[in-house]
């Protein structure tokens, strides 16, 4: 669920860091797309200029229309996708923290979003308004394993990161720890 969970100040404050888009898999795919798109773009340029710009092959033998042109367009589209991936990583979209403070009786859920008026996503509430901690499990092709906070007068607030689902034992452990800390029930098992 999180990169780290910290309970301090006499067990009255629970702080959970949530990993956003700065995951290894995102770095991996952004790098692969950048390298592949650069290769396609250089192959297209090489076929047009009849100068070899690649180390591994000789694209000067390609006919520019249609092969070189299409490779150049694929390369440009791939570089646009790679730029998007690197910007999402740089902005750490989805990253943030969950903070539960029993001293002040408040809950603060914070996430980074896309640039604009909703760049900082903050949800503040009181601990007394929490009804339960809910576990959602859906198996299949696109499995969902997530923790939600059920608060009076609001829809369920997701607490876990998006992406790779947590193991069932980790999900149950985190959910039980949070429900125990807040003094509410754990639903969905």
From Swiss-Prot:
The protein, known as: Photosystem I assembly protein Ycf4
Any one Pfam family match given in the protein's UniProt record, by short name: Ycf4
Keywords: Membrane, Photosynthesis, Thylakoid, Transmembrane, Transmembrane helix
GO biological process: photosynthesis
Cross-referenced InterPro entries: PSI_Ycf4_assembly
GO cellular component: photosystem I; plasma membrane-derived thylakoid membrane
Location within or outside the cell: Cellular thylakoid membrane
Role summary: Seems to be required for the assembly of the photosystem I complex.
Membership in a protein family: Belongs to the Ycf4 family.
Regions that span the bilayer: 29-49, 69-89
Membrane topology: Multi-pass membrane protein
The UniProt record lists the keyword Transmembrane helix: yes
Main location: membrane
């Amino acid at each position: 669920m999180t990169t780290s969970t910290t309970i301090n100040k006499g067990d009255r404050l629970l702080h959970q860091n949530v990993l956003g888009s700065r995951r290894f898999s995102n770095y991996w795919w952004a790098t692969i797309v950048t390298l592949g798109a650069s290769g396609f773009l250089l192959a297209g340029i090489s076929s047009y200029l009849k100068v070899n710009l690649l180390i591994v092959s000789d694209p000067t033998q390609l006919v520019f229309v249609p092969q070189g042109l299409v490779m150049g367009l694929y390369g440009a589209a791939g570089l646009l996708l790679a730029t998007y991936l690197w910007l999402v990583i740089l902005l750490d979209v989805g990253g943030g923290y969950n903070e539960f403070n029993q001293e002040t009786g408040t809950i603060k859920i914070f996430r980074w979003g896309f640039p604009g008026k909703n760049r900082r996503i903050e949800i503040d509430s009181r601990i007394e308004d929490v009804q339960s901690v809910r576990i959602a499990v859906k198996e299949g092709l696109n499995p969902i394993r997530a923790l939600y906070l059920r608060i009076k007068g609001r829809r369920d607030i997701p607490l876990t990161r998006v992406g790779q689902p947590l193991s069932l034992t980790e999900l149950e452990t985190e959910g039980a720890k949070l429900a125990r800390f807040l003094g509410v029930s754990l639903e969905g098992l």
